[in-house]
UniProtKB/Swiss-Prot annotation:
<feature type="glycosylation site" description="N-linked (GlcNAc...) asparagine">
    <location>
        <position position="802"/>
    </location>
</feature>
<feature type="glycosylation site" description="N-linked (GlcNAc...) asparagine">
    <location>
        <position position="796"/>
    </location>
</feature>
<dbReference type="InterPro" id="IPR001245">
    <property type="entry name" value="Ser-Thr/Tyr_kinase_cat_dom"/>
</dbReference>
<dbReference type="InterPro" id="IPR006211">
    <property type="entry name" value="Furin-like_Cys-rich_dom"/>
</dbReference>
<feature type="compositionally biased region" description="Polar residues">
    <location>
        <begin position="1503"/>
        <end position="1515"/>
    </location>
</feature>
<dbReference type="GO" id="GO:0005524">
    <property type="term" value="F:ATP binding"/>
</dbReference>
<feature type="glycosylation site" description="N-linked (GlcNAc...) asparagine">
    <location>
        <position position="188"/>
    </location>
</feature>
<feature type="binding site">
    <location>
        <position position="1072"/>
    </location>
    <ligand>
        <name>ATP</name>
    </ligand>
</feature>
<dbReference type="InterPro" id="IPR050122">
    <property type="entry name" value="RTK"/>
</dbReference>
<keyword id="KW-0472">Membrane</keyword>
<feature type="topological domain" description="Extracellular">
    <location>
        <begin position="698"/>
        <end position="975"/>
    </location>
</feature>
<dbReference type="InterPro" id="IPR017441">
    <property type="entry name" value="Protein_kinase_ATP_BS"/>
</dbReference>
<dbReference type="GO" id="GO:0042593">
    <property type="term" value="P:glucose homeostasis"/>
</dbReference>
<feature type="region of interest" description="Disordered">
    <location>
        <begin position="1501"/>
        <end position="1539"/>
    </location>
</feature>
<keyword id="KW-0547">Nucleotide-binding</keyword>
<feature type="glycosylation site" description="N-linked (GlcNAc...) asparagine">
    <location>
        <position position="940"/>
    </location>
</feature>
<dbReference type="GO" id="GO:0043560">
    <property type="term" value="F:insulin receptor substrate binding"/>
</dbReference>
Length: 1607
């Protein structure tokens, strides 16, 4: 042969194994199931899955389907379509979905399952009530480990919901590790058919369950709260089912019926069904199938084969026995010819010994031998290879003792456990049909005895005399303990000569090794469960070579010497396993073979032996070679336990996997909080039916048992240790649980390979290697990403698929225990542990196990259920009914959920009186946020409250007291009535005199004019709403969704069509409605507010678009402000809010909002409209983020907590009200300026509550005492400057809204000029007033963010000092409509000039104004509040005051709780501020928060007329000295350091009226709605004289008198 050809053949021979293995690996990866890769294991490719319907579809006949196995893919649920009966089992497993994914799934046709229902790890499924609403029967013909229903690790399952299930004919119910599953104990399982308590295994399900059934449920038995268990009230006879209405079904019905007493309308049949009718037995000519239906012979034979490949067969009944349709013939029956002698489909009864014929089988263990039990004839070869076991001979005799004939050959190979063949006690005939493949050495053989190390005897002598081998001889080799004479004796009984057989005289009867040639073996490729070996050929005469035997075994320690014969005794389990391969043809071809079914990451020893004919003089064998398989996915960690030892921690421990399949380096712990379903607890009255904590019950039981043990002898005895029986019982329970879990995993997670066919085993062809076996291999899809973990514990968060909760992951190394920190108290957590290996270069991935899952709840926090005592309050009805309403706030973060409240109360100071305790359910509390005690006796009462949560903690508040007033005596009532009448008379007389005086005083002014103007805020109650041009057709309004609740009703987002010029135009609008239950006055008020808004046409005031007054309900169509009110807008932009991507507003944005609010308020002020409720909640934000003044009182009910009911008056926004409004009820535009300052404080703090820490009553006292809020931390200069001036105590010292706009103009956007009221002809703007706006930033820009400055310097802008004679707010002095200065809107000239120092000072003396801010870093891009939001802590400060000369004694303490130390005593309001000069900063930190900088202005005298403040001031009443603030006013007037703006003649305002204005002021104070216009004064520029208008009309005065009489 040419050398080149030899080299080429050698290359080909070397490449073939590698190519074959590559193809093999590709085939394995192709077969990996992607659906199961997320579970880290590949599902089973098992023949029975064809029966279960995996991966295929069914075409049910008459609604009958075979077994169904649904996993991983929602498409597989199509297998259940049109199925009425599943003849088999239903298995659903391995889904990770959401609840929404199952809500569209429903199979109402399914009524019966003949085997079992199994569900495993179907995440997202909450109930079966919609999935199988009509499932009525589970027969349990075949069980899953003795159970008919199995629910295992169903994480989201809350209830079974099998509302129509009536019968479980056989088997138990196992519900395990379903940590949300409730309503188990409310089911009468005995009624369904599971009467044995041992058959009900309910383990590790939810402990605290509502388990409350509605009242209609009999005996409180139900599947869910609203679904009662059916059939409990059945009054029919025994074993008869009922309909829902109690009507009896027919006796033949099982599980219920549709129509009473009708066998055609049964859900299922007790016996059999034929033609959709229930019958007691099958009619003649039909065959009973599966004990439930009758088939004709054609229908029976047309059935598909069963999973084992058996064809259907007919069995004709005899002597009244039913005819059957079967897959296998029963005992005493054999398969025979059918009546027409055309096919083998008939089971025929045996006359004597039934020749039960079975197919040939390979027996590798006792279980395989049991398959041939009762068989008398084996058609085909019988192969036995049992290497080990206990009582093997006895078990084989039971299974094989009836065999009389084996038609082909008997192979007994490598059965090391066999000593004799006596178990074949009835064997007589062998080899009636010997195949040609069983020919060796030109001869055929029927009996093979090979390599049976411990075989000593063959058959009993008496039996050998009866035995016959019809064809061929016997082949006996390598039976070391089988003596040659025994073999010869057996041949003599068979009448066979040695020439007809192959018997080795060398290898039988001894274990002496033969002369051998060495073979070389190498490992070509390795997988996790397979290896490919290659070895050189047998060098001797190939004609003498029979086969190659691969011997291999697992070794624990490679360091020990490995001997071929070591351990090969009768009782050892450490034996060599073998694989047999036929010789490869070809002169130079190397031999290859594959070992499969290996364990991952395991070391094996292997050697190869060449078997030759008996006449061969040489044998061959390799040396022992070792190799280690690749690692694979570990099994799940075992004994996973989570223990709660702290409210915020869980200690998790586990044990390593049973099958690590590699080197376990770390564990992943994935956990997340399970959301509490609060709705499920609303279905139960916990006052009537209290919750019993399962763990507490167990604890009590354990304690009682401990007491019994401890008290058995004496008190010094300790608890006895557990007995051996108790320990064995516990061990047995653990073993049962482990066995069931292994059994479950075996059927859910299975390897994907099949057994090699026997013929391939003997005729191996290396070219067919990839097609021989289909095996698992690691899939990169199931591996984790490559990570580096530098620390012992690494924590990161991620979102798992199909989960909305935040999922956390912890990785631990070198330990099987971890503590999970920072958990929420009394919260349930799902904990999953995965065992993982490091990245492996051989498998190119990091392998992890499937998840071990457990659930645990953290311990409760005792303080979490405590009610905040500051929220407890009482309201006593004033009608002497003895009714007291007690209100409180629920704990903000309770232990799970507050179920009820306990209210304890009794008469005070009566110790012997038994207190009363009232239980208040959660639903009752939520109705009124409190509870009303009725008909209490007058006197002093004490009470306390406790909240009871799921943790069942009970902690009462401290005792509180209230007094129920005693009703007045009849005599005293009469006296009071008389006194009241007298006082009323004199009051009316006094008022009449005052009115007359006023009228007379105004009458004598002959040159006066009478001007009556309508005040938009006060409309006479007699006036009804009249439709006008604002009326809109109701059909043009379409409501889309709810936006929130208004004061009168719901507010909707809607669309208005054709309300503008274009009839087809649709615009988004906000639609306000009135509740259906609203009174007439409420509807009138609702439309009155709309009437008020008709007068407003300003860009920065929310526009009214129309009104629908006809019909009900009335609608007010407003401009849609898409971003809601400013309060919620600011809160939504806090850094601590959970709004990804939303940043706090920048400083320029806040200043822009402030300018827009000021512009809207300036417009209202010019319209003579006093808002009285300016707050962030009443400012609305458009989609373009433009802020507009809101809806004037319509939002009051939404923020009810922001209002306070003072005395018997209406709700007042006291936290936004000016001092004069709180004390005297005076509301002006300047009191709105005070509120504007509070709004700016809200904007700086992102909508924190003003005066935090103080109650409403304390706020009133706080402001009345002369204190203001502290500026927020990091307050910007501009905002601090404005707030300080807006909060001036005297109204005339506050800026006007137009002055505020001019101050803010340099920071406002250019677009402001185009849309603002300020820049209109009546808005007051003059040329130059807007210079330096945002469009052209100069060096004076100060765009610092809100936290860029300290609070101490917040109001100290870095200024450019330029001489100026203006005041604080630099503005134009002349504009259309009159002069415009710092003071506007009715500030009295004389009041301004009262006590003003008249000294002139030159510019050199330091008269400077704040013209602009100085240079600073531009950080306008920074967020408004970059740090986490910290609610400002309010401290008490005095109001701005510059005229007081008091001392410490003048500052009265209001008695409020101090949240922080009082202001520095050296900086009290009585101290005067130093005059500013060119070297002093008017906003230095020492003044911030206490009083504003002192600026001087030029004083312009007017006709030299200066009068004292006391002479011009008019007070309606003398202030209560207890309510007045610090002494801040001096009789000497304003100090020289006070503000002194330019004086100007202005109209008197309500809070500065003269004596002649007393009627108007009085009416306002009394709250009248009569529109009385004050005397108004106007300015004559040429003379600077005052002109008074005419007095009110006499009819107006008469109306006032009538109102007073009524009061």
């Amino acid at each position: 042969m040419h050398p080149g050809s030899i080299s080429f053949n050698m290359i080909i021979n070397k490449c073939i194994p590698i190519c074959l293995f590559i193809l093999f690996i590709m085939m394995m990866e192709f077969t990996v199931s992607k659906a199961d890769s997320k579970n880290d294991i590949v599902s089973e490719s098992h023949p029975s899955l064809q029966k279960l319907g995996c991966g295929g579809s069914q075409s049910p006949t008459n609604g009958v389907c075979g077994s169904v196995d649904i996993r991983s893919s929602m498409d597989n649920f199509k297998l259940l379509e049109n199925c009425t009966v599943i003849e088999g089992s239903l298995r659903i497993s391995l889904f990770e979905l959401k609840a929404l994914d199952f809500r569209h799934l429903s199979f109402p046709d399914l009524r019966e399952i003949t085997d079992y229902l199994l569900m495993y790890r179907v995440y997202g499924l909450e109930t079966l009530s919609k999935l199988f609403p009509n499932l009525a029967i589970i027969r349990g013909r075949e069980l899953f480990n003795s159970y008919a229903i199995v629910m295992y690790e169903m994480r989201d399952l809350q209830d079974l919901g099998l509302v129509n299930l009536r019968t479980i004919s056989r088997g138990g119910v196992r519900l395990t590790k379903n940590f949300k599953l409730c309503y188990i104990e409310t089911i009468n399982w005995t009624q369904i058919g599971v009467s044995d308590p041992e058959a009900r295994r309910f383990i590790n399900n939810k402990e605290q369950c509502p388990n409350s059934c509605k009242d209609e449920c009999q005996s409180k038995r139900c599947w869910t709260y609203s679904d009662c268990q059916k059939g409990l009230n059945c009054q029919c006879k025994e074993n008869t089912y009922c309909m829902e209405n109690g009507s009896c079904c027919h006796d033949y019905c099982l599980g219920g019926c549709k129509v009473p007493m009708n066998p055609d309308e049964c859900f299922s049949c007790k016996e059999v069904q034929f033609n959709n009718t229930c019958r007691p037995q099958c009619p003649p000519g039909t065959y009973k199938f599966l004990n439930r239906r009758c088939l004709t012979d054609k229908e029976c034979l047309a059935l598909t084969n069963d999973p084992d490949g058996n064809t259907p067969k007919l069995l004709d009944g005899e002597k009244g026995e039913p005819s059957l349709c079967l897959y296998t013939c029963p005992q005493n029956y054999s398969v025979g010819d059918s009546k027409d002698n055309k096919n083998l489909s008939q089971c025929v009864k045996c006359r004597q010994l039934c020749p039960k014929e079975c197919h040939g089988l390979e027996i590798n263990n006792i279980q395989d031998a049991h398959k041939l039990k009762e068989c008398s004839k084996i058609s085909g070869p019988l192969k036995i290879q049992i290497m080990s076991g206990s009582n093997v001979a006895q078990e084989l005799e039971k299974s094989l003792g009836n065999i009389r004939e084996v038609t082909e050959t008997i192979h007994i190979k490598r059965s090391y456990a066999l000593v004799t063949l006596h178990f074949f006690k009835n064997l007589q005939i062998i080899g009636s049909k010997v195949p040609s493949s069983e020919t060796q050495e030109g001869q055929s053989f029927s009996l093979f005895l090979m390599d049976n190390t411990n075989l000593q005897e063959l058959f009993p002598e008496e039996q050998m005399k009866k035995m016959k081998i019809l064809n061929g001889g016997i082949y006996v080799h390598d039976n070391g303990q089988l003596c040659p004479h025994t073999i010869k004796e057996f041949l003599s009984h068979l009448n066979l000569s040695e020439a007809q057989s192959s018997i080795s005289s060398i290898s039988n009867g001894h274990q002496r090794p033969c002369e051998k040639h060495d073979l070389n073996v190498t490992v070509e490729k390795i997988a996790h469960n397979a290896a490919i070996l290659a070895w050189n050929k047998y060098k001797a005469d190939e004609r003498q070579l029979l086969t190659y035997i691969l011997n291999y075994k697992e070794i624990k320690d490679e360091s020990n010497d490995i001997n071929i014969f070591q351990g090969r005794d009768l009782c050892s389990h450490d034996l060599w396993m073998t694989r047999e391969y036929a010789p490869k043809e070809g002169p130079e071809a190397d031999q290859i073979g594959m070992l499969y079914d290996l364990k991952p990451f395991t070391t094996y020893a292997v050697y190869i032996q060449a078997y030759t004919v008996s006449t061969a003089t040489h044998a061959a064998m390799t040396n022992i070679l070792t190799f280690t398989t690749y690692p694979f996915h570990p099994s799940e960690p075992t004994d996973l336990v989570a223990i709660s030892e702290d409210p915020h921690e869980l200690r998790v421990s586990w044990k390593p996997p049973k099958y690590p399949n590699g080197n376990i380096t770390h564990y992943k712990i994935v956990y997340h909080k399970l959301e509490l379903n609060e709705k499920s607890y609303e279905q139960r009255n916990y006052c009537r039916d209290p919750l019993v904590h399962q763990k507490k019950k167990e604890k009590v039981k354990i304690e009682e048992e401990g007491k019994k043990i401890n008290n058995s002898a004496n008190s010094n005895c300790c608890k006895c240790p557990k007995s051996k029986e108790e320990m064995d019982t516990e061990s047995r329970k653990r073993e049962i649980e482990m066995y069931f879990e292994d059994y479950l995993h075996k059927h859910i997670y299975c390897k994907r390979y099949d057994k090699l066919p026997d013929e391939v085993d003997l005729n191996f062809d290396g070219m067919n290697l990839p097609q021989l076996v289909e095996m698992n291999y690691n899939s990169s899809e199931t591996s984790d990403r490559i990570e580096v973990f530098p620390n012992y514990v690494i924590e990161n968060t991620s979102d798992l698929a199909n989960l909305t909760e935040i999922v956390k992951e912890v990785v631990v190394y070198g330990t099987t225990e971890v503590t999970l920190p920072n958990l929420e108290h009394f919260s349930e957590y799902s904990i999953e542990v995965l065992a993982c290996q490091d990245y492996n270069e051989k498998v190119l991935s990091k392998l992890c196990s499937i998840r071990a899952i457990t659930f645990e709840r953290t311990k409760d926090s005792y303080a979490a259920d405590m009610i905040n005592e500051t929220t407890v309050d009482t309201e006593i009805e004033t009608n002497f009914t003895g009714n007291v309403f007690i209100k409180w706030e629920s704990p903000t973060s309770p232990n799970g959920l507050i179920l009820k409240y306990l209210l304890w109360y009794k008469k005070a100071n009566q110790e012997n009186l038994v207190p009363q305790t009232i239980c208040i359910t959660r639903q009752e509390y939520l109705k009124n946020l409190g509870y009303k005690l009725t008909r209490l006796e007058p006197g002093n009462w004490t009470f306390k409250i406790s909240a009871i949560s799921l943790a069942e903690n009970s902690s009462f508040t401290l005792e509180r007291f209230f007094i129920v007033p005693r009703p007045p005596d009849p005599e005293s009532s009469n006296t009071l009535l008389i006194v009241a009448i007298v006082l009323a008379f004199f009051g009316v007389l006094t008022v009449s005199l005052i009115v007359a005086c006023v009228y007379y005083k105004q009458k004598i002014r002959s040159d006066d004019m009478t001007v009556i103007s309508r005040n938009m805020n006060y409309v006479p109650s007699e006036i009804l709403y009249i439709s006008d041009e604002w009326e809109v057709d109701r059909d043009k309004i379409k409501l889309i969704k709810e936006l929130g609740q208004g004061s009168f009703g719901m507010v909707y987002e809607g669309v208005a069509k054709g309300i503008r010029d274009d009839p087809n135009e649709e615009i988004p609008v906000a639609v306000k409605t009135v509740n259906d239950r609203a009174s007439f006055s409420d509807r009138r008020e609702f439309l009155k507010e709309a009437t008020t808004m008709k007068e407003f046409h300003c860009h920065h005031v929310v526009k009214l678009l129309g009104v629908v007054s006809t019909g009900q309900p009335a609608l007010v169509i407003m401009e849609l402000m898409a971003l809601g009110d400013l309060k919620n807008y600011l809160r939504g932009h806090r850094p601590d809010e959970d709004h990804p991507g939303v940043m706090p507003p920048h400083l320029l944005d806040i200043l822009q909002m402030a300018g827009e609010i000021a512009d809207g308020m300036a417009y209202l002020a010019d319209k003579k409209f006093v808002h009285r409720d300016l707050a962030a909640r009443n400012c609305m934000v458009s989609e373009e983020r433009t802020v507009k003044i809101g809806d004037f009182g319509m939002t009051r009910d939404i923020y009810e907590t922001d209002y306070y009911r003072k005395g018997g008056k209406g709700m007042l926004p006291v936290r936004w009200m000016a001092p004069e409004s709180l004390k005297d009820g005076v509301f002006t535009s300047l009191s709105d300026v005070w509120s504007y300052g509070v709004v700016m404080w809200e904007m700086v703090t992102l909508a924190a509550q003003p005066y935090q820490g103080l109650s409403n009553e304390e706020v009133v006292k706080f402001i009345s005492d002369g204190y203001i809020m502290e500026l927020p931390e990091n307050c910007p200069n501009e905002m601090a400057y404005l707030m300080q001036h807006c909060w001036a105590k005297k109204p005339n010292q506050r800026p006007t809204f137009k002055a505020i706009i001019e101050y803010l103009l340099p920071k406002l956007k250019p677009s402001f000029e185009k849309v603002s009221y300020f820049f209109t002809s009546g808005g007051g703007h003059t040329d130059g007033a807007g210079e330096g706006t945002l469009a052209e930033p100069e060096g004076s820009d100060d765009s610092s963010s809100i936290n860029s400055l300290s609070c101490e310097g917040a109001a100290a802008p870095r200024q450019s000092l330029t001489p100026c004679g203006g005041g604080q707010f630099k503005s134009s002095t002349h504009f259309n409509g009159g002069s415009h200065t710092l003071y506007d809107e009715g500030v009295d000239r004389e009041t301004i000039l009262n006590g003003v120092d008249d000294g002139d000072e030159d510019e050199a003396a330091g008269r400077y104004s704040l013209s602009e801010f100085g240079e600073d870093l531009d950080d306008s891009s920074r967020p408004f509040m970059s740090d986490d939001f910290i609610p400002p802590v309010m401290t008490r400060q005095p109001l701005l005051s510059h005229q007081s000369n008091g001392n410490d004694s003048n500052v009265r303490n209001s008695g409020l709780i101090e949240l922080k130390p009082l202001i520095n005593k050296d900086k009290r309001p009585g101290l005067s501020s130093p005059r500013l000069n060119a070297r002093s900063n008017p906003f230095s930190s020492e003044y911030i928060g206490h009083y504003p900088p002192t600026l001087t202005t030029e004083l312009e005298t007017l006709n030299g007329n200066q009068s004292s403040h006391n002479n011009n001031s008019f007070e309606l009443m003398t202030p209560d000295p207890l309510k007045s603030g610090p002494a801040s006013e001096s009789s000497n007037g304003v100090s020289s350091s006070s503000w002194r703006p330019k004086p100007i003649l202005k109209l008197p305002t309500l809070n500065q009226a003269r004596v002649g204005d007393s009627v108007g002021c009085l009416c306002l104070t009394l709250g009248t709605r009569i529109n009385i216009v004050k005397p108004i004064e106007t300015v004559r520029p040429e003379t600077n004289t005052i002109r008074y208008l005419k007095p009110p009309h006499p009819m107006l005065i008469w109306s006032t008198l009538k109102m007073v009489l009524v009061l």
